[in-house]
Structure formats: structure tokens, C-alpha cells
Amino acid sequence: MEIIEHKVEFKYKSIDEYQWTDNFKLDKQWEILRFKKNKIVQKSYMNRFPYSEPKKDYSIALYSKNKWYCLKDGVGSYISIQKEKPQIKDLTITEIKYEPYLVIYKLDFEYHIMMTILHCDERVKLLEYKRPFLKEGIILFNEMKIYVYNGLFSYKGNKIEDFELFVNEFNSQYKENYDRLFKIFGKSNHTHKSIDYKTWCKAKRENQQEWPLFTNIKIKDSIEFPNNSGIYYYYPDKYVGLARRNDDNLIPLIPKIYRKNHYENKNSLLYKYVNGLPIDEEENIPYSFIKEKYKNIKYHEDEKIIEVDYNNNVVKQKDMAEYYCYNNKLIQKIEEPVKLPKIEAQILNKRNERVEVLIDNEWKNLAGNRIDGIPTLPWNYKHIIHDYNKLGRLKKGKIMDLTHIGIVNENGTDIITWPYTDDLYIGRSIETKRLITFKYQKNVEIYDKLIDM
């Protein structure tokens, strides 16, 4: 028998529940707190939502790493893969005990033969009738809900001794009837849980549309997980990498299907895992983290924001930013506004990333994210200046923002300014694609030298 999860029960020093819950500060480890008296009051970190629900009998419930810690009248409990003492902030643990909760038995039996034996026993009730091509079964025996896989039984509950008796009894029946039934069912029916229960016991279908295929032979573009396990994951015409888990599994990674080869990406979790590199924790901004009062309000152009993408990478920002913005919505207030150096203008590359800045009238290499609210030059700004010069619409003056230059006005009323007009070159034709069409329009003249305006 192998214990996968423990039921942890502990006693703690008496607390004033109202004051304790009011003072408890949530963070990325302790995400949600529920307080139940006359009604249930919930507060959460970054407006997160739980993947599961706590047991009904509690006064205080804390949610961390996909599990609930339930407290009531000086006694607490939770379910954990690890046999560890809980470290709950501002709570003194005085006594603790562990009991097996989720256990498995690995035996040598073929799935369909065992299911046939179970189905013939009057004490066993099949909760779902499994067709022959399916590979997992659920039965009810002596009020125990037992899962059956190829070569493996699993049970979650308090009747561990009864479960052991069940396993021993039906394993004996299997050995007695094996030769007779093997002629009917002789094919192995392994599943993800039967080959590696610890990895897949809490895996959610919501995390990925489909699980990778597995084999015990190394093939092209397959990955071995865990290391030295002899289990290889693959998927036809795609690649298998590693993704982060949301639960308290000892190995915080799980195989997942991808379109690109993660072996070739030094920043991927697969590359770091295979090469024994440290895997840092990272935190993405969830969709649920949208403040209620900003939920349906797009930010105003004058709002001081730092815009981020889904992976929490900064896309652009303003000086003294006060809010984080995602998908045109304010999602979090910044406690200390971010002060930027005094930059007069910036030049972007093709990916809209900052490559140069103008400080004290001098261009300097300073790569980073785009800064909003200052004159900005796109990667092809020289072409734009050249074309407006040929159209006679360039004037000496301050640097203008050239990222939103629209359609040229054929009446010649749109002018751009540029401080450095002495060393401009004149090409043979218009170079910006969106301006080429104006070569043949009415009232548009093209010049071969800078017009002094």
C-alpha cells in the first residue's frame, strides 16, 4: 500500500475569530479566506477563485495551493500530499496528527479481467458501466468508492483497513480465475494513473484539452518524466513540454502538449528540468484580478498606467504610473508610483520596444519597454521624415510623435516638425508604403530638395 495523501488534524491556541480574520493578510500563498457565522464572508487575494470547496463544518476556511484549511473551536484539518506541519500566519499549533486518506495498491492484474471478477460479485456495485474499450472503473463496495485501473486500486476515505481486506480478497480471486479469463481479455490497458498515479491523480482536464500519450520506449520528440522513471510522453505532429501545477504535488510540473519544441528554448520549464537548472516561481495576472469598480471601464488616455500582457511582461508605461493595466482595463493600484528618468523622446524597434532615448538633447542606447506620454519615433521614422520632406510638408522644429501619422492631406495642411534638417537625404522615390499612393493624387507635388518653410 502506498499513501498518496494524508488527512492532517491539529489543535491550536484559542483566537478571537472576528479579530483574527480581520487582521489576516492574504498573499499569493494564502489566497482566500472565508468566515462563516450568520452568513459567509469571503475575501481573496487579487480576486482569485478556488478550484474546490471546503467541507461544510467550519468557522474559518483558508485556501492555499488548491486545498482548504478548515478551523473551528480550536481544531483544524486539511488534506495534504506532504506530511508536514501547517505554517498558518498568526496561529499557534499545539498538537498535530496524520492519518492516511488517499491510498493506492499496485498489483499485477489486467484491468478487464479484474472488472469482470468484480462485476460477478453481488457485494460490488458498478457506479458506471464501463464499456470494454474504456480503461478506468468506479465501484462501490461496503460503502467505499474505489477506483480501478490497470494494475492499480485507489481509495479515498477513512476505511483504510476495510480497503486492505478488499484488495487482498479480490487479488486472490484474480489469481484463481486468471487463466480462464485471460483467453477473453489478454490485452494490457494502462492509463496515465496506472503508470504514474502521483503525477496524474490531481491533474485537471481544464488545464489542457488532452493529455500526452505515453510509452515505455524512448521515441523521437518524447520526454522522460519524472527523470529516470522509464515513462516517455509524446504526441503525434506536436511536442510535449512541462507546465506548472496549481496543487501541492512534490513535483510542481506536469507534461503538456505544445506546438513548439521546448527543448530548444532555454527559458522553458522542460529545458531547466532536464538540465537540473533552478525553476523560479512566477506569477501571472489572472483574468479574475479586475477590480469591481473598474470592471467595465476602459482606462482614460490621461490615466497614469503600466500596461502588461497576459504573462505579466510590461508592454509600455507612463511616468509616475499609478495603476497596472491589462487588456485596456485597470487591474491593480500601484502602492508606490514608478518614477522614470527625464526622457525627451524615444525610438522603437519593429516589436515596439524602446531601443534609444533622448536625454539632455543627446541620443543614448537604453533598451526597455515603451514609455507612454513622450514623443515616440517608430523604427521607420527616417522614411516618414524623408517622404514628408519630398511632399514639402517638413518644417524645422521640435521632435514630433510619428507613431500615429495618418493619411496625408492632399491640400497640404498637415505638417511635421524635425530639428535636424541640415543633413537630410533626398531619395529617388517615396519610401513609406502608405504614402506612395499620394504620388498620383491631385494637388500633391513631390520635390527633390528641402523646402524652406
UniProtKB/Swiss-Prot annotation:
Q: Which InterPro entries match?
A: DUF5483
Q: Which UniProt keywords apply?
A: Plasmid
The source's domain of life comes to Eukaryota
Q: Function, please?
A: The presence of the two linear plasmids, termed pGKL1 and pGKL2, in strains of Kluyveromyces lactis confers the killer phenotype to the host cell, by promoting the secretion of a toxin able to inhibit the growth of sensitive strains.
What protein name does the entry list? Uncharacterized killer plasmid pGKl-2 protein 9
Protein's organism: Kluyveromyces lactis (strain ATCC 8585 / CBS 2359 / DSM 70799 / NBRC 1267 / NRRL Y-1140 / WM37)
